[in-house]
């Protein structure tokens, strides 16, 4: 999720996408921007191209974007296929002794999918154990996922504390993660 991981000034998302040197990262970042802009069809069309990519991180991003865009489009069976793809990435990473960073990305994607779908995270290692291996923007979004899960479990004080801790550690403006963190804060205060 290269756009989520990017620090940029609000209003500069497209310029940030355009600045990616790697064409595949730029394409996935464009799919993210489409998704977060309510353009699910365009997001899905790009994500679909990367569902079987040999680069597990591109494949994970594609799986998440494909799954959630298909939910928006009313295609639950396609969405389930994307979620299975995420599970497969974790299995492949573990089998091939991938780096801690790649495994952390797989665990993050698994938690993102299960928590936001309100499903149990059975079989996934604890996300908190992998936070140090995630880059700053993804780490901030991962903590949002932990906070969202705490909220779902009615642990409102914990959710607030997690959100507040992210703002203390950020070294820049990560608008996507920050927006979702603010949403959890508002949910907890209601």
Regions found by a protein language model. Give the residues of each.
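Amphipathic alpha-helical segments of tetratricopeptide repeats
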Residues: 48-52, 86-95, 125-133, 164-174
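TPR-adjacent "capping" and linker segments in tetratricopeptide-repeat scaffold/adaptor proteins
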Residues: 14-24, 131-135
